[in-house]
């Protein structure tokens, strides 16, 4: 990680915070969640802990807890909303699901299982929480704090794809051919259980041969991430697409007269761009 120290503005931290608070007020950025919305979030989290998995399966969701999914996020992250499992299929395996690629019926070489945390499972339609989420729209990030879309009891707790716990998810199953083209894809509601909580640096080190992953993670994950990532980048170039890797900016007020800015690349490119925020999703979007 590269770091550079900038003396950009000589102001006490309290003044910086006050200025940011003024901006939030001017643009009506939400602050605390209304009590009614928080109460709903806490109630649905409690309900899930009691019998949520059983209710989800009874409602027709797939039991996908046999999949060795893992999450890949920055160190210390608690809002784990994506998990992935990559597989190399036996030779000439026919793809299942609706064909969406340029060559329907082509033999699949790889299978991507991609789970997205189902926050909607915890939001009663038409309730106070539903209305508040509609008002917020997205998480807003500022140098001093983030204004979350969901209450932390959900995003960091009941809905987060934490290790070794059952969670509701939208599960994509995407088959790719030997060139990395999409052969088929389907999505379904599912109950999943992450096997390991990994960091970008940890996975990149394993890809580079400079580290190992926990025994609970699939042993072929680093190699398949690099292999599939490279193929998907080739497909992107072939269709005229462009990838831009921008640094993640982390700003810390460290003293009265100094601001420290740490610029960390959003992902490492030694694996063909396979490990970067968003690129744990092996199939890119246009």
Residue ranges: model-predicted function:
Residues 2-8, 16, 20-22, 37-286:
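Electropositive polyanion-binding surfaces
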Residues 27, 31:
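Alpha-helical structural modules in large enzymes and assemblies
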Residues 34:
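Conserved beta/loop motifs at nucleotide-recognition and modification sites
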């Amino acid at each position: 990680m590269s770091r550079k120290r900038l003396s950009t503005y000589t102001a006490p931290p309290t003044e910086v915070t006050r200025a940011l608070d003024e901006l939030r007020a001017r643009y009506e950025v939400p602050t605390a969640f209304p009590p009614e919305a928080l109460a709903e979030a806490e109630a649905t989290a409690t309900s899930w802990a009691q019998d949520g998995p059983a209710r989800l399966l009874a409602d027709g969701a797939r039991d996908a807890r046999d999949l060795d999914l893992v999450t890949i996020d920055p160190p210390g992250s608690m809002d784990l909303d994506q998990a992935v499992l990559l597989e190399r299929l036996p030779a000439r395996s026919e793809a299942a699901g609706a064909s969406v690629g340029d060559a329907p019926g082509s033999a699949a070489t790889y299978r991507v299982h991609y789970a997205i945390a189902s926050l909607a499972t915890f939001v009663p339609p038409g309730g106070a929480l539903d209305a508040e989420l509609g008002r917020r729209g997205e998480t807003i990030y500022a140098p001093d704090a983030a204004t979350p879309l969901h209450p932390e009891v959900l995003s960091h707790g009941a809905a987060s794809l934490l290790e070794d716990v059952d969670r509701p998810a939208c599960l994509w199953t995407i088959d790719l051919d030997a060139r990395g083209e999409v052969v088929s894809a389907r999505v379904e509601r599912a109950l999943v259980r992450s096997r390991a909580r990994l960091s970008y640096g940890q996975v990149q080190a394993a890809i580079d041969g400079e580290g190992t992953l926990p025994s609970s993670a699939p042993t072929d994950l680093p190699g398949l991430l690099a292999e599939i990532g490279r193929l998907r980048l080739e497909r992107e170039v072939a269709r005229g697409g462009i990838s831009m890797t921008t640094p993640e900016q982390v700003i810390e007020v460290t003293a009265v007269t100094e601001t420290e800015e740490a610029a960390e690349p959003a992902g490492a490119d030694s694996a063909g761009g396979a490990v970067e925020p968003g690129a744990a999703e092996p199939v890119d979007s246009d």
